[in-house]
Amino acid sequence: KILNPLQIVLSGDKGSDTTKFGLFVPTDVSNSQSPYNFLLLSMYQGPETRVLIEKATAVFFEFINSILEAGDLEMDVGNGSEFIATKVLFVGDLKMLPFVFGVDHSSSTTFCPLCLVKRNDHKKEACSGPVRQLNEPISLNIPLSNIVCPPLHIIQGLTNKILEVSDKEKRKELFKNVKIKASYRETSLLTGRDGQKFLEFVVKNPEKDVDYRVTLTKLYELSQWASVEKYKILTRDKKSVPNRLVSVINEFSQSWRNDKLTAINKLHLVEAHLADFIILHSGWGIFGEQGIEALHHLGNIATKCCFGANQNNALKVH
């Protein structure tokens, strides 16, 4: 079942040496975040830069902008056609958004893609800043309210930040108990799937000695809102959703800050913008970036087949 109005989610990400762009249509079915539901429309071998991304996505984004301008999309229905009201969203990590929307880089003082909060203010307490205005020209005419707080990167990033400052020996023993291994990448201890397994283990095994247990438990509770299946259960009583959601976010935020953990960018998205997004769009994980992330492995194989091994990072768009 396609959500009504028709919703199209665009996404872009770099995996290995290949940058990919595409879209998917969220559907009310199990495994809606499967990579088989993701339509890969543009791929090039090379880094994430504004110039390369604009070249690689020019035709793709022009088509999307025409939908945004019209507000609907003509679709075949039965023996004829019908114009369907259409909403377009974009999901990407905090490194991709500046290249697509021209916002400040995630390492800037005004690091948030959605507001102009100052980094020092965010470090002191949960807060937000004036709503950001996108400067012309921009590649996509998507309103800021339709930029997804990326669920996979947020939950994974917050989990890994806690693990980074946890006792190494305890962490090693816990990984053994959960039957997971640390990622080979220095920038990320656990992948999204293993990170979720770890959070579940912490919650279901209260007898284990775990650093930052309360915060990890609160993070697990937050992660349930990112699960497509769990979200349906959590929102059966629709009237209570805003209060319960805000309560979960506030409890997690307070625990994180009480533990004096680093106030990273992803924490700000949760504290200042996540509740508004979920309430406005009636969902979170269903708009997530899992599909394109799962394509990275296939993309690496495709890159080798299309471009050959050891190619220079010249723009090659398919």
Short names for language-model regions:
Residues 1-318:
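A structural signal for the principal folded core domain
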